[in-house]
Amino acid sequence: MPRKPDPTRKPELLGQILEHLRGRSLATVSFRTLAEALGVSTYVFVYHFGNRAELVAEIVRAVVARNDALLTVAVSELDREAFSKHLAKVWHDVSTERGRDLHRLELEAALLETVAGEADGTARGAVGRWVDHVADWLSANAVPPAEAKVAARVFVDALFGLQYDAIVSGDGRRASAAYKQAVEILVSRVPQR
């Protein structure tokens, strides 16, 4: 009789894979390289992920999902100060060494999705999720929806660009100072209550 599948094994493997990939490229992903790095059989990956394409898709979903807790905050209920604190938490999370490593993987995945013509790719959709998140707060605070969407896009592009800057330049302080200013400009669009 076959052994019952362990529902915790796949998420555990994904966590180990993400840690392994922090200093590597998605292009290096194969069942063999991961099996060697993690000390398991290639069969384990075939069993849990099926094929390389599904494995990479699961990795990308896990990378993008790292921000789910931040994106589920009900920002429409926050005042300026609380929203500023929320955005400070966002920067804290994304600017850690792990956050920068995972953002680099997300950027790589988004570029691969672009080249493959995947308009609805998981990584490509990450920016839109952030734009909607920020626009929700602006709209809830009397900024007209069209204006809120544009302001949110400007802010999120700054967020992603500053993360890229911190990764490439290695100067997290400079990126943090610019992010703080971007938050102040965004929040100032909403009058004090």
Give the role of each language-model region:
Residues 12, 16, 20-58:
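Helix-turn-helix
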Residues 68-74, 97-107, 115-142, 153, ...:
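Amphipathic alpha-helical packing segments from all-alpha helical-bundle domains
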Residues 61-68:
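Short, basic, alpha-helical segments at the C-terminal edge of helix-turn-helix-like DNA-binding modules
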Residues 24, 112-117:
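Short loop-to-helix capping motifs
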Residues 1-8, 193:
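N-terminal intrinsically disordered/low-complexity leader segments
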Residues 96, 112, 156-173, 186-193:
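Amphipathic C-terminal alpha-helical segment
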Residues 58, 71-103, 151-155:
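Hydrophobic alpha-helical connector segments
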